[in-house]
């Protein structure tokens, strides 16, 4: 061991008189250093001694300066702050000088803190401790210049460590903001315009001519995905064999059927990759232009439904083409799908044997039905085998379990879009599904793909619906739908865990939302098996809701998103696709007829003619009754004609219901009332129990009594003075309505039409010749009756106007009689003193002369003393100038008839006395067609004249 390795023996020396500021350890350390240097180099010791003396002298000088400074402080208070600063600087210089002097003495010493009884400043202690930590280990062998620079290096390291510790303790968001502010300028300069826009121009992403090219290769439609998988497997296999293909990418696009796309640097690499591949046409290669790359490679959300067990699909090929199936499993290569199908079997019943003895299968497509073991054993037992598990069979090479066929189909023969299962198809799979008979999750997965392909939402969210976010960062957030767009729903937050989101709008995918309902809400089902049914919510179970159906009164479990709030119990039946509508008159059987008052999905509520309300299916309705206008006519209890649209009132016991007639079927009236709530306000009444309140075209007073016009025809004759304003609406409907008429005067003279409206003076006519309606005075119309025109006044039973001459049709009697005959009601009775028109007994309405209701008494005419058509006593006729009772057409005296020259009360066609027959010639009276002929003499008729009874046309 060398001397340098031995520990140095240090002896304690007494401290110098001026070393008051040095501690014992420092003095001990300085003494040891001095002895070592004296042994090695005495000159250095002397120099060290001189250096120590110089330092002591400097310290004494400093003390003297401090004393002087203290005296100056007492004398000059103004410079106190400056002197304190000087003292601090001097102390720092003194400490630094001490540090330099004892830099190399602590290499082999353990420095311990000394307990000082004196009270010192906390700042001094902290500073001393910091210095001790810095000087604990130093490099004594380093050069002096290096030793002098080390404090500065240590300070830099400490500053770096402090900054790093602060950065670690800093919050992540604050640190990100700091970095963003620090490097914002350089970031913007580097990115250029893209920093502001946030997007990169499509042209910057375009490949160059040095990049690989993309080729489109034509293939068999429907085989695109299969070819892509095969090329991928081929590339992996050849890579393992050390002969890799030079193609980079293989893909296909759903939007471009019949093509696959391969990315390669050379076309010959594509030819090599496609060697031995089927369903692909290698010669039909197309180089895709560079400008079409963005459209070709643009990411588009696939509309394909993920094929997984349980979803509904349809078969594209074979005997099961178009049939609904359920995916049971997938093959390992992903090219085959095992499906569950309802089998179509005839068990060989329709098979035929050909000339060669082979069985020819029938081309008739059997109906879908579950597999029947009994039929298979009965008709085709040799091809039936028992399966490996209970209730399974193998028939003709196919496996059947629980009556369903389980068969493998190629992936390209499976249709996953636009499946849309019907209710009848879903019922066939009811045996194995849940309590509702449907696999709701499978239907939801199927509908999700269908609606996504069409750009529609899979659920019916409407503005105002209350929803809850099911998953994501905002889960459990409740809001109200304010806007819907495709599969994105905008909601207004009403309740959230973070108050900052309240009243804010969020856009959420429709699949992440769930509708909120409460017990007691009345809802309608908009999707699923129970579509369009209504019910009352009785239970909420997660995403599903249990309701009581209004139609079946049974519990139904459906998804909450399949419901909407309903205001009524009736369903929105698809009337556009139905043969029957509400309020239609239908026939259920030969004896039952009724009106539809409610239409459900498959059930109609019908109110029958006997007042019963029955529910029938659409198949239970025989036909819809289409009655003509003529058939829907009846009479009420007063004999007034009633039609569809008239307002009637039922008078039966205490009932007093009123309404408009909706349908008329025989004696039953279906009446719609605004005062009744049940059955849409429709009730049934018998026609004999109602009275007319108002017709469709006019109003009848409710205080009308019995219809006297039907009892006494005499009341139909109006006052001649009031003929111009004659009212024809006696007892309800205007008699002229819906009659064919002809115009007799005016600019429309000769035109014919049908009366559609009428008032007291005018009638509105719809012309037959052209589609036009005209307004004409009723007096200018002729009514067409049995093909013959009848003047309007005669049609309504009124007398003709007196300003116009009208020749008599038959004859007249003596004075004091009516216009047609004495003592007789017009056109009813005739004869002398109430004799019937045909002779004999009295008429029911006849009487003596002067008793006609519409005219004056005493035999005097309205215009004179004589009758209008005959010559009575006491005055001349209106058309005759003969004194006495001369007839208009006759000049004989007395009461001769207009058509005869006989006396007294002879009939129009007879000249005998008394009530002789018209065709009798007894008692000197000749018949109208006998001895008194028109061209003969004697007691002649109207066309002959003799002995005073001269005819108007002859003078024989």
Curated annotation (Swiss-Prot):
Location within or outside the cell: Nucleus
Quaternary data: Component of the SPT4-SPT5 complex. Interacts with RNA polymerase II.
Similarity annotation: Belongs to the SPT5 family.
Chain intervals for the UniProt region annotation (Disordered): 1-156, 805-835, 886-956
Its biological purpose: The SPT4-SPT5 complex mediates both activation and inhibition of transcription elongation, and plays a role in pre-mRNA processing. This complex seems to be important for the stability of the RNA polymerase II elongation machinery on the chromatin template but not for the inherent ability of this machinery to translocate down the gene.
Sorted UniProt keywords: mRNA processing, Nucleus, Transcription
Gene this protein is translated from: SPT5
Listed InterPro entries: KOW, KOW_Spt5_1, KOW_Spt5_2, KOW_Spt5_3, KOW_Spt5_4, KOW_Spt5_5, NGN-domain, NGN-like_dom
Polar residues bias locations: 939-956
Chief place where the protein resides: nucleus
Any Pfam family hit: Spt5-NGN
Molecular function terms from GO: chromatin-protein adaptor activity; DNA binding; histone binding; mRNA binding; RNA polymerase I core binding; RNA polymerase I general transcription initiation factor binding; RNA polymerase II complex binding; rRNA binding
Transcription keyword on record: yes
Biased segments, Low complexity type: 924-938
Compositionally biased region (Basic and acidic residues): 26-66, 130-156
Protein name: Transcription elongation factor SPT5
Skewed-composition ranges (Acidic residues): 67-94, 111-129
Entry's Gene Ontology cellular component terms: DSIF complex; rDNA heterochromatin
Highest taxon of source: Eukaryota
């Amino acid at each position: 061991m060398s001397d340098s390795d031995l520990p140095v023996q240090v002896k304690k020396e007494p401290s110098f008189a001026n070393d008051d500021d040095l501690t014992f350890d420092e003095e001990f350390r300085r003494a040891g250093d001095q002895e070592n240097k004296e042994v090695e180099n005495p000159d250095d010791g002397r120099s060290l001694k001189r250096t120590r003396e110089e330092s002591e002298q400097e310290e004494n000088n400093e003390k003297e300066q401090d004393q002087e400074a203290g005296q100056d402080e007492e004398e000059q208070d103004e410079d106190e702050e400056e002197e304190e600063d000087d003292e601090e600087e001097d102390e720092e210089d003194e400490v630094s000088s001490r540090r330099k002097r004892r830099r190399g003495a602590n290499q082999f010493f353990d420095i311990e803190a000394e307990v000082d009884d004196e009270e010192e400043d906390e700042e001094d202690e902290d500073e001393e401790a910091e210095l001790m930590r810095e000087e604990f280990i130093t490099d004594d062998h380093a050069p002096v210049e290096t030793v002098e620079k080390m404090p500065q290096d240590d300070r830099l390291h400490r500053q770096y460590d402090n900054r790093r510790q602060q950065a670690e303790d800093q919050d992540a968001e604050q640190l990100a903001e700091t970095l963003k502010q620090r490097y914002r300028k350089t970031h913007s300069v580097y990115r250029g315009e893209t920093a502001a826009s946030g997007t990169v121009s499509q042209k910057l992403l375009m490949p160059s001519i040095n990049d690989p090219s993309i080729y489109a290769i034509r293939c068999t439609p429907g085989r695109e995905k299969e070819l892509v998988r095969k090329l991928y497997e081929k590339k992996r296999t050849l890579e393992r064999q050390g002969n890799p293909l030079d193609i980079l990418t293989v893909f296909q696009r759903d939007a471009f059927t019949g093509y696959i796309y391969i990315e390669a640097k050379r076309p010959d690499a594509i030819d090599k990759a496609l060697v031995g591949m089927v369903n692909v046409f290698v010669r039909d290669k197309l180089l895709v232009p560079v400008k079409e790359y963005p459209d070709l490679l643009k990411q588009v959300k696939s509309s394909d439904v993920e094929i997984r067990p349980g979803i509904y699909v349809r078969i594209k090929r074979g005997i099961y083409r178009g049939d609904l199936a359920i995916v049971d499993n997938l093959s390992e290569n992903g090219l085959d799908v095992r499906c569950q199908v309802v089998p179509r079997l005839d068990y060989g019943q329709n098979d035929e044997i050909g000339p060669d003895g082979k069985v020819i299968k029938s081309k008739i497509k059997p109906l879908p039905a579950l597999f029947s073991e009994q039929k298979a054993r009965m008709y085709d037992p040799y091809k039936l085998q028992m399966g490996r598990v209970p209730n399974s069979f193998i028939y003709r090479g196919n496996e059947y379990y629980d009556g369903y066929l389980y068969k493998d189909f190629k992936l390209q023969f499976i249709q996953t879009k636009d499946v849309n299962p019907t209710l009848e198809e879903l019922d066939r799979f009811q045996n194995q599904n849940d309590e509702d008979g449907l696999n709701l999750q499978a239907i939801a997965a199927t509908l999700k793909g269908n609606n996504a392909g069409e750009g529609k939402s899979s659920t019916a969210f409407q503005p105002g619906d209350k929803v809850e976010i099911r998953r994501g960062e905002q889960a459990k957030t409740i809001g109200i739908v304010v806007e819907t767009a495709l599969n994105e729903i905008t909601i207004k937050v009403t309740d959230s865990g973070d108050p900052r989101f309240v009243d804010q709008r969020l856009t959420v995918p429709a699949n992440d939302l769930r509708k909120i309902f409460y017990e007691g809400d009345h809802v309608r089902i908009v999707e699923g098996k129970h579509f369009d049914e209504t019910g009352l919510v009785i239970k909420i179970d997660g995403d599903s809701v249990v309701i009581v159906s209004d139609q079946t009164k049974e519990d139904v479990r459906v998804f909450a998103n399949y419901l909407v709030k309903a205001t009524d119990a009736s369903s929105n039946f698809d009337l556009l696709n139905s043969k029957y509508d509400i309020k239609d008159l239908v026939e259920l059987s030969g004896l039952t007829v009724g009106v539809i008052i409610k239409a459900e999905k498959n059930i109609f509520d019908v109110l029958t003619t006997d007042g019963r309300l029955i529910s029938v299916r659409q198949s239970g309705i025989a036909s819809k009754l289409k009655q003509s206008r003529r058939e829907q006519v009846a009479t009420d209890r007063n004999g007034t004609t009633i039609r569809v649209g008239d307002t009637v009132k039922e008078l039966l016991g205490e009932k007093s219901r009123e309404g408009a007639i909706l349908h008329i079927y025989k004696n039953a009236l279906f009446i719609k009332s605004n005062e009744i709530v049940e059955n849409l306000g429709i009730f049934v009444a018998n026609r004999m129990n109602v009275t007319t309140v108002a017709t469709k075209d006019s109003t009848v007073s409710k205080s009308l009594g019995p219809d006297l016009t039907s009892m006494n025809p005499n009341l139909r004759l109006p006052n001649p003075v009031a003929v111009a304003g004659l009212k024809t609406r006696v007892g309800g409907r205007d008699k002229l309505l819906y009659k064919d008429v002809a115009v007799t005067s005016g600019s429309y003279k000769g035109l014919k039409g049908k009366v559609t409206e009428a008032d007291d003076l005018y009638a509105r006519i719809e012309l037959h010749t052209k589609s036009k309606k005209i307004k004409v005075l009723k007096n200018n119309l002729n009514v067409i009756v049995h093909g013959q025109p009848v003047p309007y006044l005669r049609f309504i039973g009124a007398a003709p106007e007196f300003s116009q001459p009208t020749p008599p049709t038959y004859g007249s009697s003596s004075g004091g009689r009516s216009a047609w005959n004495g003592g007789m009601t017009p056109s009813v009775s005739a004869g002398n003193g109430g004799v019937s028109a045909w002779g004999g007994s009295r008429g029911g309405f006849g009487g003596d002369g002067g008793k006609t209701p519409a005219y004056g008494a005493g035999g005097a005419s309205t215009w004179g003393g004589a009758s209008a058509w005959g010559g009575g006593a006491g005055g001349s006729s209106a058309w005759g100038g003969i004194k006495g009772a001369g007839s208009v057409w006759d000049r004989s005296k007395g009461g001769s008839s207009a058509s005869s020259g006989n006396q007294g009360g002879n009939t129009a066609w007879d000249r005998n006395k008394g009530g002789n027959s018209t065709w009798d010639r007894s008692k000197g009276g000749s018949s109208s067609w006998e001895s008194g002929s028109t061209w003969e003499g004697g007691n002649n008729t109207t066309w002959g004249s003799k002995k005073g009874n001269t005819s108007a046309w002859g003078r024989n």
